[in-house]
Amino acid sequence: MFSAAISVFVLATLTAATPMARGIVPAPPAGQCNVGTQQCCNTVQDASSDPAAGILALLGINVQDVTGQVGLTCNPITVIGGVNSNCDASPVCCENNSFGSLISLGCVPVSL
């Protein structure tokens, strides 16, 4: 019994001590997303496309730093039955939605 308790303690300690990069949030796997990060975007493009690259440049974001696709003119998808619960454009899950509805970064498609 004592050795099992020690094993659990050691495993928990090693898990907590695993190094992780600060400030980097990994993108969710394609098709999986938290409800709070789902967006309905009018268009979804590569970061290097002319419209996306232009907006990224205005925001001071290097195109090479963007992983995944970029959503333009996005609105959050709310809970089922809410005002914004359906999406007639491109439903995506994005890493970074901190630029209002203008642009969302690190987007992957999701199924609603």
Curated annotation (Swiss-Prot):
One of its GO terms (molecular function) is structural constituent of cell wall. Keywords: Cell wall, Disulfide bond, Glycoprotein, Secreted, Signal. Glycans are attached at residue 96. It is found in: Secreted; Secreted, Cell wall. SMART domains: HYDRO. It holds the Pfam family Hydrophobin. It comes from the Eukaryota. The keyword Disulfide bond applies. One of its GO terms (cellular component) is extracellular region. Induction: A CT-rich motif, which is often found immediately upstream of the transcription start point of highly expressed filamentous fungal genes, is present at the expected position. One additional CT-rich region is also found upstream of the TATA box in the promoter region. Disulfide bonds join 33-93, 40-87, 41-74, 94-107. Transmembrane segments: none annotated. Belongs to the fungal hydrophobin family. Self-assembles to form functional amyloid fibrils called rodlets. Self-assembly into fibrillar rodlets occurs spontaneously at hydrophobic:hydrophilic interfaces and the rodlets further associate laterally to form amphipathic monolayers. Aerial growth, conidiation, and dispersal of filamentous fungi in the environment rely upon a capability of their secreting small amphipathic proteins called hydrophobins (HPBs) with low sequence identity. Class I can self-assemble into an outermost layer of rodlet bundles on aerial cell surfaces, conferring cellular hydrophobicity that supports fungal growth, development and dispersal; whereas Class II form highly ordered films at water-air interfaces through intermolecular interactions but contribute nothing to the rodlet structure. This is Class I hydrophobin 6. The gene is Hyd-6.
